[in-house]
Amino acid sequence: MPVITLPDGSQRHYDHPVSPMDVALDIGPGLAKATIAGRVNGELVDASDLIENDATLSIITAKDEEGLEIIRHSCAHLLGHAIKQLWPHTKMAIGPVVDNGFYYDVDLDRTLTQEDVEALEKRMHELAEKNYDVIKKKVSWHEARETFVKRGESYKVSILDENIAHDDKPGLYHHEEYVDMCRGPHVPNMRFCHHFKLMKTAGAYWRGDSNNKMLQRIYGTAWADKKALNAYLQRLEEAAKRDHRKIGKQLDLYHMQEEAPGMVFWHNDGWTIFRELEVFVRSKLKEYQYQEVKGPFMMDRVLWEKTGHWDNYKDAMFTTSSENREYCIKPMNCPGHVQIFNQGLKSYRDLPLRMAEFGSCHRNEPSGALHGLMRVRGFTQDDAHIFCTEEQIRDEVNACIRMVYDMYSTFGFEKIVVKLSTRPDKRIGSDEMWDRAEADLAVALEENNIPFEYQLGEGAFYGPKIEFTLYDCLDRAWQCGTVQLDFSLPSRLSASYVGEDNERKVPVMIHRAILGSMERFIGILTEEFAGFFPTWLAPVQVVVMNITDSQSEYVNELTQKLQNAGIRVKADLRNEKIGFKIREHTLRRVPYMLVCGDKEVEAGKVAVRTRRGKDLGSLDVNDVIEKLQQEIRSRSLQQLEE
């Protein structure tokens, strides 16, 4: 009979099989009331599942990450319960958990309206408030199939026929009259599923195949308590205000259009931000001793066959042909950089060779995945490749890591999660080579006092990598930086150098990106700053305004002086009230507004206001210029007097 070992090491002995709920009741009624599921010998199980042999057991509650995931999964079943009550002929497909919530794909003979979604959510609340028990039954494959055939659930039957072995025992979860099929676990009672909201609907093909029927996907979010739900909804509201697509339109930064899906039309102000970002990156390339190069936009398909991209990546590549030759528009820059490396004989004395490019790349992303600047088809990478010896890997990775943190800190990103991906089962190279490479990456991170977690087996077949994920002010994750070792591509493209022993050797290649896609990073910055770009990045840094026509000449002189000082400035001499002008330029997020009235003209000064509404008073013109230059030169995140 089972001996149950709890997380604190204590043991409980039973003379009969017990469930996690039985053990929780044995410990105390409070824990039993909070029990959602159990973890038995490391495996998640339902609270009602029986433990027949000695085992370790952890009780899962809503405070656990797994508990919240189970709540979300059960809310998907609750959605199924509600939709079948409102529209009984609906056919249910799949209802998994996703980030922050869940969805259910349904086959319904009507297009769901916003009113339908509201009615569905209302019915879900009515059902959840009944606090009914969720009953799990393990049945034979044949019984499960018969159940869903009788209910007309053709998608469930398809899952059984194609995805579940005939000797398996599927779990059927009974929500009163509604039955769903799942591996589980699920909540034991619907009292855990009170805090949810349906978010949106979308189209989705059955099994993700465009040859299949288009279903309706209903998305929802669910949380353990009302406070967490409200906090999430507030974050979404704030994110909507910061949406780079909305701000990009307000500030006239860029646009996209149907004739060029996933391609950016940069307007003057957006392109100003892009170019300033390039200037910043170039300053770091110089500091960290990189060469800057430029490769062609397209190369013969034969080259992409040599690299392996054609076999593994051709669906994402745009192609064209000329004079009976097929060309690929480059989806990445590395093969071109190897071609540059291959020009001329290289010696070990030439290494490390650090090669950087603002590489214009194109990838044939699915149209449904395109999203403003965040997911595009045409983009520019702040890409670099370092050619080095095995002995130089650690020092080069060390420098890459310092560069990553140096650049991210300029934008105020402080929370950065780092992951080290190790060797997969299918790989090239010896175990000794992988041992050394993984150790070099780990030691480089440790030497920089950077905590990291391993992603075992998640490296590429050609080498391990470090991924840097930054978190923005809304605590959203953005995977931007990568340091990837590559033991394959240089060999495939016949790259070599002459070693100290006068023998030809293949260099190690380090792929290094920090911002990732320039377009995407500008999207991230737009949302991070809500369009209030730091002064050094702002398209227009200063607007000079008159109050009446008598100050026009002074405004023009001051504007010219600011331009000569390297400041991006505009004069606003319109015959409008000064309050109107200030409001308009505040909405345009211009960092500084300089107001010139008769007093300022007489004293040779200027009244300074910030876009946050702070009045800095009447200041000497030369002092203002000097302070602005210092703020811009230092790439400060703060404005004057902050």
Curated annotation (Swiss-Prot):
Gene3D superfamilies: 3.10.20.30, 3.30.54.20, Anticodon-binding domain (3.40.50.800), Bira Bifunctional Protein, Domain 2 (3.30.930.10), Threonyl-trna Synthetase, Chain A, domain 2 (3.30.980.10). PROSITE patterns: AA_TRNA_LIGASE_II, TGS. Its EC number is 6.1.1.3. GO terms for biological process: threonyl-tRNA aminoacylation. It comes from the Bacteria. SUPFAM superfamilies: Class II aaRS ABD-related (SSF52954), Class II aaRS and biotin synthetases (SSF55681), TGS-like (SSF81271), ThrRS/AlaRS common domain (SSF55186). Keywords: Aminoacyl-tRNA synthetase, ATP-binding, Cytoplasm, Ligase, Metal-binding, Nucleotide-binding, Protein biosynthesis, RNA-binding, tRNA-binding, Zinc. The keyword Transport does not apply. PANTHER family: THREONINE--TRNA LIGASE, CHLOROPLASTIC_MITOCHONDRIAL 2, THREONINE-TRNA LIGASE. This is Threonine--tRNA ligase. The gene is thrS.
